[in-house]
Amino acid sequence: MNLNATLIGQLIAFALFVWFCMKFVWPPIINAIETRQSQIANALASAEAAKKEQADTKNLVEQELSAAKVQAQEILDAANKRRNEVLDEVKAEAEELKAKIIAQGYAEVEAERKRVQEELRLKVASLAVAGAEKIVGRSIDEAANNDIIDKLVAEL
C-alpha cells in the first residue's frame, strides 16, 4: 500500500503548500487586487465627476456665450440708435445752417440791391441836376444842388 502512503504524503505536501500560499502568497495578491480595484473605482468616479463637471462647464459656457451675444446685440442696437440720432441731429443742424446761409445770402443780396438802388438814385439825381444845369445854362450853388438832389431822391 504504497499508494496510500504516497497519497497521504502528497496530501500533506499539498495542504502545506495551500497553507503556505494562503498565509504568505495570497494576502499580498489580494491586497494588490483590492488596491487596484480601489484605484479603478476612484478613477471611474473621477472620470464621472470630470464628465459631469465638463457638462456643467459646457452649459455655463453656452449660457455665458448666449448672454454675451445678447449683450453684443444690445450694444449694437444702442450704437445704431445713437448713430441715427447723431445723423438726425447733423441733418437738422445742416438744414438750419442751410436756411441761415440762404437767409444771409438773401439779406446780403437785398442790402446790395438797396445800396445799388440808392447809388443809382444818386447818380440819376446828379445826372438830372447836370442836365438841368445845361438846360438852364448856369450853375446852381452847392447847397441848392444838394437840396434838389435830396428832393429827387425822395421822389424816386
From Swiss-Prot:
Gene name per UniProt: atpF
Domain of life: Bacteria
SUPFAM superfamilies named in the record: F1F0 ATP synthase subunit B, membrane domain (SSF81573)
One Pfam family hit: ATP-synt_B
Family matches, as PANTHER family: ATP SYNTHASE SUBUNIT B, ATP SYNTHASE SUBUNIT B', CHLOROPLASTIC
Statement: the UniProt record of this protein carries the keyword Transmembrane helix: yes
Presence of keyword ATP-binding: no
Keywords, alphabetical: ATP synthesis, Cell inner membrane, Cell membrane, CF(0), Hydrogen ion transport, Ion transport, Membrane, Transmembrane, Transmembrane helix, Transport
Chief location bin: membrane
GO molecular function: proton-transporting ATP synthase activity, rotational mechanism; proton-transporting ATPase activity, rotational mechanism
Family: Belongs to the ATPase B chain family.
Function description: F(1)F(0) ATP synthase produces ATP from ADP in the presence of a proton or sodium gradient. F-type ATPases consist of two structural domains, F(1) containing the extramembraneous catalytic core and F(0) containing the membrane proton channel, linked together by a central stalk and a peripheral stalk. During catalysis, ATP synthesis in the catalytic domain of F(1) is coupled via a rotary mechanism of the central stalk subunits to proton translocation. Component of the F(0) channel, it forms part of the peripheral stalk, linking F(1) to F(0).
Subunit-level organization: F-type ATPases have 2 components, F(1) - the catalytic core - and F(0) - the membrane proton channel. F(1) has five subunits: alpha(3), beta(3), gamma(1), delta(1), epsilon(1). F(0) has three main subunits: a(1), b(2) and c(10-14). The alpha and beta chains form an alternating ring which encloses part of the gamma chain. F(1) is attached to F(0) by a central stalk formed by the gamma and epsilon chains, while a peripheral stalk is formed by the delta and b chains.
Protein name, as recorded: ATP synthase subunit b
Localization per Swiss-Prot or TrEMBL: Cell inner membrane
